Every structure is written in C-alpha cells, then in structure tokens.
Amino acid sequence: SCFSGVLTRPLNTFVIGGFTMICTNEDTKLINEIMRDFTNITKIAAIFVNNRGKVLSQEYNFSPFCKVVRRNPAYAKRCNQCDLYGGLDATKELSSCPYRCHMGLIDFSVPIMKDGAILGFIMAGQTKTEDTTIKPILPTQTDWHDDTKLRALYRTLPVLTAEQIYSATKVLRILVEHYFPFNDAIAEEMPYEQLPDFVESERPINRPEIRKAM
C-alpha cells in the first residue's frame, strides 16, 4: 500500500487488479518538484505515469514532436506501451537503462516507490543520439517518416551523446531515491494484467514479483 500516516485527500487514485494505489497530495507535490528541478537543469522532457502507463502529471519540457505524436490515438497507445514497458524494465533491472521508443527517440524510466508499493514511473527523454547501442523497447518501430510535419519537428529535437544520456539517468535516479527510497526487499507484487508475449520473449523478466504479476 502507499498509505503513510494520516492520508491527505487522494489526488491520483487508480485501481489495479483489486489494489487501490493512491498518490497523496504530498506524493504528487514531491514528484512534480523532482521533475521540475530535473527538467530545468537538463532541459530533458519528463512526465509521471501510473502502473498502466497513464499520464498523471503535467508535461515538463515536452517537445513539439512528442506533443503532436501523443495527439494521434494510435501513436499515443504505443507511447503508453513504451512508458509502461520502460518502467517494468527499470524496476526488474534495478537500473534506469535508456531505450528507444517506438518513434526512435531515447527515453528512460525511474520507478517511484513508497511503503513497498510502486506508485508509478517518471519517464524522461525525448532526445536523439547517434549512439547505436541503445535498443528499442518494442519489437517494431512506428513508420512515421512520410509525415512532413513530424519530419520537420524531429529535426528540432536535442541531440545528446551516450555519456550525457547515462548521466541524466543517474541524476534523475539520485533525485528520486532521495525522496522515495527504493527498497527491493519489500517491493510489493505488481498486479499487472496479462502483458503481450513479446515482453517476456524479448526481455526475460527474472524478478519474481513481476513474473508472478504477469
């Protein structure tokens, strides 16, 4: 559960597999402060999503490219998938390895935990890189390159080196763990519904609490 002491009025409430997950006003305030400070310093975009990939915060430093992409229902669905699977990976690996989203941009995720429950994930990124070692999170990429508007917006995206990207992931994780310490030993089993087979086949999930949840 994510209750701690006297609960203030729930701001973000969502039910997963019978479990009620609540971000209190104080939780949400801290999460937004983390994202604001991180994006102000790095100029990298960030949002907070729940355990279903649903966005629960304002968009911090969002690129025009991604704003247009997420207004397309088909694209937005794949964005949510990337957010969710990126969060799963970050949780099971206990690290925040960057990945390529379905549009080819570099993103990374840091889990937010409280009292052994995962409240959600801070998703950050929306950058380009020439580094070819960062792999896609989904098995197929979205074919968007015939869209003239998206091509023009893509050219305006920031380009980071691999070192800059990995430094950003480290900074965000340090910020998050200062306010929301990550305790793997007491991590609650995440009550996910059945996920697509490729999540297991492409990236074997070894953490028992995630495997049981699937």
Language-model regions, residue ranges each:
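A broad, low-specificity signal marking well-ordered, structured residues that form hydrophobic/aromatic
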Residues: 8, 97, 122
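A short, hydrophobic, proline-anchored segment that marks a local hinge/packing element in signaling
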Residues: 107-115, 124-127
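Structured interaction and signal-relay segments at domain junctions
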Residues: 18-104
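Short, Lys/Arg-enriched N-terminal segments with co-localized hydrophobic residues
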Residues: 1-20
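Juxtadomain coupling helices with adjacent low-complexity linkers
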Residues: 21-40, 120-211
